[in-house]
């Protein structure tokens, strides 16, 4: 794309752009002292300014030097690309941050495919650049004029969003960041790829398992058809991506889906979110093992160090309160405001759904399975010793509240409903059944159509 030094009109111009490419500040200063107009010139063919060359090559000192001299941060080259676009393409995060600090416009479109800097960061897989641009989009006039959600889902002239590009190029890190920031997982392309493709179709085409995992975990529909009537499973088969096809097969078990529409899930603190995401990954990994079992495709075996980690986890569980739903794992998540605690897998099972309902805009919020109270927040549970008599367990807290909530058969969620939501959490299902039989045999099955 001509991001280096192309034809120059004079020898001084060539030396000037060459010095910018190499980051030679002394040479630049000397050339500018002899001819200050060099700062305003561009290369002959590609129309690259000194900012374009500095940004594409990661020369932050050169970039800062000319921005301080008043160089326009939104200068465009022959393809209407800005220095910010080139920095995002090449993954030069320092230059991206510097240009954003200089109020570079993130809502400019090039003339090649009408793509923004967000498209370019997603296409080339630069997660740090993507995050920086998204952070800027929440505080710049773009958020007021366009709206953040619209910017995240901006389309190029082929109808491709940044999520489409990240999925097609096999960029799972970018897929995750975009989904967390509101990218529409079910959006259809125009003429990009095959018309009417979703991000899942494009991930199936690229054969990237990690992208497929993340899209499925955020509710991507395996039955959605493109304009040719193909589902993602058919696309993966045609491309000979066997493992991807196995996971996308409509007859295989549904994956657990991150319950993003729930308000308290969107407001999770990082520590609690990490625990629940790990539980989601483990649940879907168990599902994958069952699907791929007996085929020539298999997941990597755990490393030798994983056994010792499991031993440590078992030791930790023995010293802390066990989850009163599964009786298998330590309580790591606390429900607020009631204070009841559960392990992360059981909390996830309470909130998750197996198949999203696109017609349900406002999903019912699950209640605490112990006291039937509403859930305002989920936080990391404080470590509580199982042998500490001064600190009541979740079961004890429930019994104390039994006078206030004597009719446990009412509510939108229950222990009895947890096993069906857990999917592959077989151990949790057994423990959950015991609780259902003893305490809440008549509870209604929860509805989590999100």
Swiss-Prot record:
EC number(s) stated in the UniProt entry for this protein: 2.3.2.27
Pathway membership = Protein modification; protein ubiquitination
InterPro entries, per database record: Ankyrin_rpt, Ankyrin_rpt-contain_sf, RING_XB3-like, Znf_RING, Znf_RING/FYVE/PHD
Q: How is it modified after translation?
A: Phosphorylated by XA21.
Instruction: Determine if Transmembrane is one of this entry's keywords.
Output: no
* One Pfam family matching this protein: RING_XB3-XBAT31
Q: Which reaction is catalysed here? A: S-ubiquitinyl-[E2 ubiquitin-conjugating enzyme]-L-cysteine + [acceptor protein]-L-lysine = [E2 ubiquitin-conjugating enzyme]-L-cysteine + N(6)-ubiquitinyl-[acceptor protein]-L-lysine
Disordered: region residues: 291-312, 385-450
GO process annotations (BP):
defense response to bacterium; protein autoubiquitination
Q: Which domain of life is it from?
A: Eukaryota
| Record text on subunit structure and interactions | Interacts (via ankyrin repeats) with XA21.
Q: What does the protein in this record do?
A: E3 ubiquitin-protein ligase required for full accumulation of the LRR receptor kinase XA21 and XA21-mediated disease resistance. Binding to XA21 may stabilize the receptor kinase and maintain its protein level. Autoubiquitinated in vitro.
Specify the protein name: E3 ubiquitin-protein ligase XB3
Q: Can you name the source organism? A: Oryza sativa subsp. japonica (Rice)
């Amino acid at each position: 794309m001509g991001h280096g030094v192309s034809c120059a009109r004079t020898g001084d111009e060539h030396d000037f752009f060459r010095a910018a490419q190499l980051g030679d500040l002394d040479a630049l200063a000397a050339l500018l002292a002899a001819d200050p107009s060099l700062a305003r010139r561009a290369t002959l063919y590609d129309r690259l300014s000194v900012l374009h060359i500095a940004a594409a090559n990661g020369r932050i000192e050169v970039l800062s030097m000319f921005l301080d001299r008043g160089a326009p941060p939104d200068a465009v080259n022959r393809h209407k690309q800005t220095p910010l676009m080139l920095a995002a393409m090449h993954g030069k995060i320092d230059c991206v941050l510097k240009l954003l600090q200089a109020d570079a416009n993130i809502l400019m479109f090039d003339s090649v495919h009408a793509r923004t800097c967000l498209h370019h960061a997603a296409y080339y897989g630069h997660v740090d650049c993507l995050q920086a641009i998204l952070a800027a989009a929440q505080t710049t006039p773009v958020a007021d004029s366009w709206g953040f959600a619209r910017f995240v889902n901006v389309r190029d002239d082929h109808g491709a969003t940044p999520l489409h590009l990240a999925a097609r190029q096999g960029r799972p890190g970018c897929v995750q960041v975009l989904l967390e920031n509101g990218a529409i997982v079910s959006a259809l392309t125009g003429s990009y790829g095959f018309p009417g493709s979703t991000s899942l179709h494009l991930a199936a085409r690229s054969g990237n398992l990690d992208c497929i995992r993340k899209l499925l975990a955020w509710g991507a529909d395996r039955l959605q058809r493109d304009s040719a009537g193909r589902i993602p499973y058919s696309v993966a088969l045609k491309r000979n991506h066997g493992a991807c096809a196995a996971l996308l097969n409509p007859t295989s078990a549904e994956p657990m889906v991150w319950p993003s529409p729930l308000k308290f899930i969107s407001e999770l603190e990082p520590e609690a979110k990490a625990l629940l995401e790990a539980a989601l990954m483990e649940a879907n990994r168990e599902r994958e093992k069952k699907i791929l079992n007996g085929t020539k495709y298999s997941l990597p075996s755990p490393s030798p160090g994983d056994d010792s980690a499991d031993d440590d986890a078992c030791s930790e569980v023995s010293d802390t309160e066990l989850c009163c739903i599964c009786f298998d794992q330590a309580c790591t998540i606390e429900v607020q405001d009631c204070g009841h605690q559960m392990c992360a897998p059981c909390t996830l099972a309470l909130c998750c759904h197996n198949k999203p309902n696109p017609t349900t805009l406002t999903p019912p919020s699950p209640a605490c399975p112990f006291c039937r109270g509403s859930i305002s927040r989920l936080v990391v549970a404080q470590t509580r010793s199982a042998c500490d008599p001064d600190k009541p367990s979740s079961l004890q807290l429930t019994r104390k509240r039994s006078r206030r909530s004597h009719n446990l058969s009412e509510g939108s969620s229950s222990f009895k409903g947890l096993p069906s939501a857990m999917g592959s959490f077989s151990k949790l299902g057994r423990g959950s059944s015991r609780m259902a039989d003893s305490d809440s045999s008549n509870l209604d099955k929860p509805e989590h159509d999100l």
